[in-house]
């Protein structure tokens, strides 16, 4: 598991715990979108999970460069990325009721709450 952090670590305990679980932790603060996309591609991930999506600090320009074959939107914001490069969104019925599923640009994968 590789993680890329674009916002700069504030030394939070949670961040440190997650970093210990990863094989690779990429500190991308100050990197351009193209540089970060290249760093991700070098690691050849099968799936890239975007936890920021539309929130502050999101890496939309990097995601738009499709640095992994499959990109998944999850957790950061209960909304669609609106982009064509994000393939799936992990959602539950509280975030996206089935009758509203067409508002997402991604294919939806429903998970249990």
Regions picked out by a protein language model, each given a short descriptive name:
Residues 101-113:
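A charged, well-structured terminal subsegment
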Residues 1-86, 93-101:
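Conserved nucleotide-cofactor-binding alpha/beta core module
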């Amino acid at each position: 598991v590789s993680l890329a952090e674009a916002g700069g670590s504030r030394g939070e305990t949670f961040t440190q715990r997650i970093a210990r679980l990863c094989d690779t932790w990429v500190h991308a603060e100050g990197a351009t979108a193209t540089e970060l996309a290249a760093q991700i591609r070098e690691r050849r991930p099968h799936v890239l999970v975007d936890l920021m999506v539309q929130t502050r600090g999101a890496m939309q320009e990097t995601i738009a460069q499709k640095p992994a074959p499959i990109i998944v939107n999850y957790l950061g914001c209960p909304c669609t990325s609106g982009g064509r490069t994000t393939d799936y969104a992990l959602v539950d019925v509280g975030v996206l009721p089935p009758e509203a599923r067409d508002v997402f640009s991604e294919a939806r994968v429903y998970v249990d709450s």
